[in-house]
Regions:
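Conserved glycine-rich Rossmann-like NAD(P)H-binding loop of the short-chain dehydrogenase/reductase
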Residues: 28-43
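Substrate-binding pocket helix/loop in short-chain dehydrogenase/reductase
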Residues: 94-96, 100-105
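Conserved glycine-rich cofactor-binding loop
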Residues: 13-14
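Residue(s) in the substrate-gating loop at a strand-loop-helix junction
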Residues: 139
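C-terminal helical subdomain
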Residues: 179-180, 198-246
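Active-site helix of classical SDR
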Residues: 119, 155
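The beta1-alpha1 cofactor-binding region of Rossmann-like NAD(H)/NADP(H)-dependent oxidoreductases
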Residues: 57-68, 101
């Protein structure tokens, strides 16, 4: 195996995670993580043309599976330099009194607890090595609450607080912590949120020139390739057509 640094990416099989995998493939050996075994296999085959690839199949919500899979990494793979906490989702867009508890559980379990589970077991490695860089994918929804965003916004506000807490607690261990907060990004995000309602999903991006996964992947690459003494702690990325969570210039 080459001397490239190792980057672990959660939610690697679609959207921002998939774009980031391809963006980083020329520079890093990659551990790609996701729930879909077939998609992981297909992505691994493509990425292996450019770099060394290891796949870990797990659901970030399952803390025992997360622990087991990360603990199973061989000596060649266990010294993770970069963690991209990308796995996340939104479910529903409802007034809080009309929301579904199952949707709330999915968002909190994935966006908050899942991020914590993966971070916990990777940090055991990074602290031992006295180095590392964690990049948490937040959201503009973690900076501004918008109508019907309630629980999704809460989950991303939690990511914001966790990122800040990590940066403080891990400073003495020589570990950088960055957070990237995208605005509207045209991925499968809205299809998941609206339960595969394509018409409703498409309406989110109608009349806009939104960000795409590759845009955020380039920002991630920039953040992790800054000089060793530079830590970009927090960055919000919007399309030109988006001024805030609710102010959009539709054509």
């Amino acid at each position: 195996m080459s001397e490239k640094k190792i980057a672990l990416i959660t939610g690697a099989t679609s959207g921002i995670g998939e774009s980031t995998s391809f963006e980083l493939a020329n520079q890093f050996s990659l551990i790609i993580c996701g729930r879909n075994k077939d998609k992981l296999y297909e992505l691994s085959n493509e990425l292996s043309k450019k770099t060394n690839v290891k796949t870990l199949e797990f659901d970030v919500r399952d803390k025992e599976d997360v622990r087991e899979k990360i603990s199973s990494l061989s000596d060649d793979w266990k010294n993770i330099d970069i963690l991209i906490n990308n796995a996340g989702n939104a479910h529903g867009l409802d007034f809080i009194h009309e929301g579904k508890i199952s949707d709330w559980d999915m968002m909190i379990d994935t966006n908050v607890k899942g991020l914590l589970y993966v971070s916990k077991y990777v940090l055991d490695i990074m602290i031992e090595n006295n180095r590392g860089h964690i990049v948490n994918i937040g959201s503009i929804a973690g900076k501004e609450v918008y109508p019907k965003g309630n629980i999704y916004c809460a989950s991303k506000f939690a990511v914001d607080a966790i990122s800040n807490g990590m940066r403080i607690d891990l400073n003495k261990h020589n570990i950088k912590v960055s957070q990237i907060n995208p605005g509207l990004v045209e991925t499968n995000f809205s299809m998941v949120r609206f339960k595969n309602d394509r018409e409703r999903s498409n309406s989110v991006y109608a009349g806009l020139n939104p960000l795409v996964g590759d845009d955020i992947a380039k920002v991630i690459s920039y953040v992790i390739n800054c000089p060793e003494n530079v830590n970009i702690s927090d960055i919000t990325v919007l399309a030109k057509s988006q001024a805030s969570s609710t102010v959009l210039n539709r054509k």
